[in-house]
Amino acid sequence: MELKRMQFTGSVWRPPYEANSLLLQATIGCSHHRCKFCSLYKDTQFRVASREEVERNLEIAQLYQPKARRVFLTGANPFVLSFEKLKILATLIKIYLPEVQNIGCFARISDIKQKTIEQLMELRQLGYDRISIGTESGDNITLSQMNKGYSVMDIVEQCRKLENAGIEYNFTYLIGLAGKGQGERNAINTADTFSLLHPYIINVLSLTVFPDTVLYEEIGMGTFIEASEYERIEEMEMFIERFQPSNCVHLLANTVSNPIPFIGALPKERERILKEIQSIKNNFREEDLRDYRKRIKSL
């Protein structure tokens, strides 16, 4: 009997915490595609998976994972899909996989902006929850320099819409993104921005620049200077000290971009995490951490 495989176009990315979710292709590539540091979808033109593609994959998923409880839609930002298309996706998922409880995906702040609070509430009822937002920073200068396409005010306004709709969300924080000498500003402003909101997870990555990015070209021209590994650690330390969540937030710094991985819950484990960071500063040399980053070939 021939093994049937679900079809995906190009590279597939998902957060570490979605490891147990069923992956389903909803979009291909990125609708924004202008962030200076990113080349994940460089050679992939953005498009929406057709209904036929989605149903073909769901038929296969039904064979091998009929009791799946969570689906993670792949693509850089499937939440860019219209309200109606997201409704259709959720309906199809329920038809083929009736035990699915919730649906996650990557999202841009601009994707949320397109939807009304009433539409978001209906999407929550259909199962959309714990969407992962590539905020990267809560500092306006950094967001602008990296062509993120939105401001701190946009982050706060749109995430409050999610909260009012009952949709939980996760953030990405990319340390080192502000460049050399700017880590303190980025840490303080990002902590202050995130403190206004209620993310479930903050997924911490450390900037890793690859040759096929605009940022790599700027480094070559001298218009962007990378933060040292120690400055990045200090940025993370300042963020943790300043961040004041009103709910339990899971801090995950355990991707390949983090030379010394750690995880913890804030505010409960703040002191333990800070002690771990101090231990990293005491026991690892800048050159060793830098050598590790140079060996990273992909994320």
Q: What positions do the PLM features span?
A:
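Catalytic cores of alpha/beta
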Residues: 118-120, 179-196
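Conserved, mostly hydrophobic/aromatic
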Residues: 30, 38, 54, 73, ...
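Auxiliary Fe-S-binding modules of radical SAM enzymes
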Residues: 1-18, 195-299
